[in-house]
Amino acid sequence: MSKRNTPPLRSSGINTIQINAAREMHAQTVRARRMPMPTSGITTPSVQPTAAPATPPRHICNNPNNPQCLHCGSVIIPSPRATLPLEDNPSISINDWTISSRKKPILNSQELDIWENEKLKGLTLPEMIFGNNYIRIENSKQHWSIEFNALDALKEVQLQDSGIRVAYSNDWINSKKRQNSTNGAQRFTNDVNDDSLNIIHKYDWTYTTRYKGTESSPESKFRLDNDQKLPLDKLAVHDKILFYDDMILFEDELADNGISILNVKIRVMNERLLLLSRFFLRVDDVLVRVYDTRIYVEFDENVVIRESKEFEGKYQDVLAKHRLSQSHDPKAALRDSNWVAQNTPMIKRQCEIIQF
């Protein structure tokens, strides 16, 4: 009887030692994530701490797509639910006041045609228009509201020549004069000037607008009072922000010669709100301009203050105030509207008030 040669058993799979090591490593990780437990062997009956009843917030979140946070009460922006086309309509109410906003994409080609041919005749439109965006502040008891939107802002752009020229315009005119002189057309030399540019549509190509908001009432309820000032002491208090939004209404890069942009932002606290509408213009090597409009509302007192400031200065004068020699981009500060507003002379201030 022959003896069968049986091959030696081969170990397959993961070694038992490796498995145990992996289990121990996992257990250590789990233990590290657990909160430390008391080591005393004496057990005491657990007593549930009695928490004081929380004061119910007086603000109401009106949009179910933008619920308030269960921990801090703030309105959740943007909405957690995605929709097509993209749209966001957060809203909040405090006392008789309701603050709402809407965000949508830039105007499509069909909407642009309607704006250019019907709503804004004679104005060549900016490159980007968020025409369906707005921020609205409304008092339901007084049937009054003020809204910031792109259409009404662009309606205040002048349909005439602003007189502002890009930095190289004089060089272009001088080159034309030299060219005419070289070609023997001396009699036409003096005819090459701004009038010979053949501007078909005369409008302010910088899109400068002194837009201060659109009121619902036919006549403004604001009363001029330049002695009024924004209560900076109240605004300096670190109150919880219940509602915040920030949006662009329109923007244009001026054919790579600068920037023209209108931006609106708002923050709402429990007792007050502050809105800032800022038009920022920078024409490279020519000028900078900032037009600020701030709306302040005190909810309990039903007071509305509107303050407008205009800043303007020559490009090189403002640039000279930027002394960061270690910066690789010395003109970076001129792309910051906050820095420009702080370092540009104020040429006008106006303050108005409403007391309901």
Curated annotation (Swiss-Prot):
Keywords: Cytoplasm, Nucleus, Phosphoprotein, Signal transduction inhibitor. It is found in: Cytoplasm; Nucleus. GO terms for cellular component: cytoplasm; cytosol; nucleus. Interacts with TAP42 and NPR1. It holds the Pfam family TIP41. It comes from the Eukaryota. It comes from Saccharomyces cerevisiae (strain ATCC 204508 / S288c) (Baker's yeast). This is Type 2A phosphatase activator TIP41. The modification Phosphothreonine is found at residue 55. Residues 36-55 are annotated as: Disordered. InterPro entries: Phosphatase_reg/MetRdx, TIP41-like. Involved in negative regulation of the TOR signaling pathway in response to type of available nitrogen source. Indirectly activates the PP2A phosphatase SIT4 via interaction with its suppressor TAP42. This interaction is enhanced under nitrogen limitation conditions. Also has a role in regulation of NPR1 in response to nitrogen limitation. Residues 40-49 have a biased composition (Polar residues).
